[in-house]
Amino acid sequence: MKNLDKYLSLLNEEVDGLLLTSRYSRHYGAEFDISEGVAVVSKKGCRYFTDSRYIESAENGIKGFEVLPINQFTGFIKRINDAIADFGIHTLGFEENYLTVGELMSYEKNLNAKLVPFNKEINGFRGVKEEWELDRMRKAQEITDKAFADVLPRIKVGMTELELQAELIYCLYKNGGQGLSFDPIVVSGPNTSLPHGVAGERKIQEGDFVTMDFGVLYQGYCSDMTRTVAVGYATEEMKKVYEIVAAAQLAGIAATKAGVIGKEIDAAARKVITDAGYGEYFGHGYGHSLGLEIHEAPNPNPGNPNPMPLGAVCSAEPGIYLPGKFGVRIEDVTIVGENGVEIITKSPKNLIIV
């Protein structure tokens, strides 16, 4: 089934049209990425609106939609209302998670159809990947693995976190990345206790841990990985914590397969860390799904009481963070299968000393 057909399957007498405003839903439905635009989906026709900066690309790349230009400065309202009239739409399902209050107020005031929140339905399909999507994600992760191998010998005592971040970004693009899936996290020494720390002017020192969390975009799909490496040497405590995190990740991976409740996967990994006495230092979830966005649903974390579906792609990233001392996180990306997972991150997970 084509992605657009999945959207059409949502339509009924109660919701007879969809308003796609997020880049991600438009990309999914049209199977082509345009950064600016709006699309209307109905059983009587589908239209995609974008401005002069993107119209040629849209006309050449988008399939299944009639592509029409809009004036960049006057917006989408007239085009949407024309579609509402031409297709006889009475109720538009919209993505409430991707609209500002101002945008929603404008649509409610000016559109000639009833608007109903429909984000869960519109974006629910993305939790299960088609094989062609998985191939793109495997390629994205392959690029990320190559970048990690390339950046390791570039880590030097005396360089700043920002300098290492620049080297990492270069390696990501050099190996085929078409964009960054998020701003890389590069932290060192005591800054590694900050799960989402920001690279700064701190200079890397002998005996530091360095944590790098990074990913690329490939044909619109994200990769994600984290590795913590030691510079010069690692203390016994550093080695101990690293091994606990590695064991927790393995426990989470072993617990993951289609049908297992998301929070139970988290619990399997969390138990290893808690039993080792570090439970209070693991504050975030075990993982998250990813695809067109770096954070999607469903998630293998404590807040998910639902089973993980076959074909979901999710991260496995437990961590321990000791304030003022150091932190460790190890992250791989996995594809959920019937009897386990396919780990598409291929970089080594043993403690690397550079």
What is the meaning of each model-derived region?
Residues 1-354:
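Active-site neighborhoods and metal-handling regions in enzymes and metal-associated proteins
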